[in-house]
Amino acid sequence: MPVTDGLRTLLLAALVALPVTLPTSAIARDVAGGPRAVEPNTLVPAGDARYAPAAHPDRIVASPAADPSRGFQVSWRTAAGVDAPLLELAVAGDTPDLGEARRLRAATRAFDIEQRLSHQHQVEVTGLEPDTLYAYRVQGAGGWWSPWRQLRTAAAPGSALEFLYFGDTQNKNASHSTRVVLEALRHAPEARLALFTGDQVSGGDGEDDNEWGEWFDAVAPLASTMLLAPVTGNHEYFEEFEDTPQERRVLGHHWPHVYDLPDNGAPDAAATTYWFDMNDARFVVLDGTSALDLGTAEAQAAWLDGVLRDSTQAWSIVAIHQPMFSPRQDRDNALLREHILPVLEAHRVDLVLQGHDHVYGRRGGPVEGQGTPQYLVSVVGAKQYRLSPEARETMAPVAEDTQLFQVVRIDGDTLRYEARTATGRLYDAFSLLGDRESGRSLVEHPEDRIPQRDCERAATLKGRADRCWE
């Protein structure tokens, strides 16, 4: 019998009307939960080797050269046995045919940590054109290559710049920092730089490499496609000879292997301080832990003074982990205010980007009516502390129990700053206008900001009253 349109319609209607019985396992149901458990610091089960080095390259990160308009620096990891692999580079185009790629050979160092022997590779890419999109990939073992990635070099002075600023990630990176990074990328599609102000991991307890593995998972969408500028925090250090008279701070093993940074740092802190120019801004990275605990505050201040004095850039941005003015209860970095603060004020640095205290706070400098510097403290990760009473009086806005990211846009004589929560809601916004010589003016943007956020918990799941969350 021929199937007419009418018959086809009847057959379909009959099929739709037939009852369908799904297996019980396929039906989603709410499950009653018991008491909330404390979440572990990583999602890695004991004995799991998911972050062991392999033939395929991973932990790929691009960092700024001193002149990011002409080059950048790339680091990556493989299993041991891969020596001096290649980086391939070409001007990106719309065709899969990237032409004859330029080839650069990496410098290789062995890295043995927590029973994992890896090889870390670093390449300095030079001789590039400003504001140009390049494609690059890195080599592993046996002819294995990473996927092609794309990165645009910095533009010449006079061009607009958008960048991201992140506070401490530190704890539970895969679980909690990932969503903040992804949300940040939604709000800053033109970002060319991501600046992290220290404590990227917590460190210690035989989990250091797993934590770095999770950190790279969390930041993977941006680590190799824009320049990543890291700051050392106290958790990038560890205590040697702990609880003895010889106790001292020592830089963790990952830092010099994971990052390849400009070689222009301060005396006695050369591995952890550096500067670079990008479009109209000079960025300077300090090491607060070294300044506070290793006696380099005076040397870093003198170096900072020279770097800022020699700058011809219209804007200056300084990043340091420990704040000049701490918003957290029972913290005070007086040594930084003694040595570093006068330099920041003398040069009218525009933004001082900080972390460490796991809350949010903003304040201007001690000079009344002066728009700059603006001192910022922020946090990405799950660890959340509480504000001090002094911070509530001297800073605005402030926040507890809030994961944040910041977007900064510089265009000519205007800098616009926005702090947004993990869900993208606007928490803080202001602009700096004018030039440094005549003095910048601060313009607040209160419209569309959400109300102040305060911690509503008496203690954490572990019972700590000094924290809002672990």
Give the label of every model feature segment.
Residues G93-Q120, F163-R179, S202-G204, Q246-E247, ...:
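Acidic/histidine-rich helix-loop elements
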Residues A80, T169-K172, Q200-G204, N234-F238, ...:
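Solvent-exposed loop/turn segments at secondary-structure junctions
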Residues P2-L11:
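Bacterial N-terminal signal peptides that target proteins for export
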Residues L15-L18, L22, A26-Y165, R186-P189, ...:
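Acidic, histidine-bearing metal-coordination/catalytic regions of metal-dependent phosphoesterases
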Residues Q122-E124, L133-Q150, D209-T312, H339-I340, ...:
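Extended active-site neighborhood of metal-dependent phosphoesterases/phosphodiesterases
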Residues Y165-G167, A194-D199, L228-N234, D287, ...:
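Active-site neighborhood of phospho(di)ester-bond hydrolases with catalytic His/Asp-centered motifs
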Residues L161-V231, E236-Y237:
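Conserved, compact domain cores that house catalytic/ligand-binding motifs in diverse enzymes
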Residues S290-D293, S311-L351, Q370-G371, R386-P389, ...:
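Active-site-proximal segments of metal-dependent phosphoesterases and phosphodiesterases across multiple
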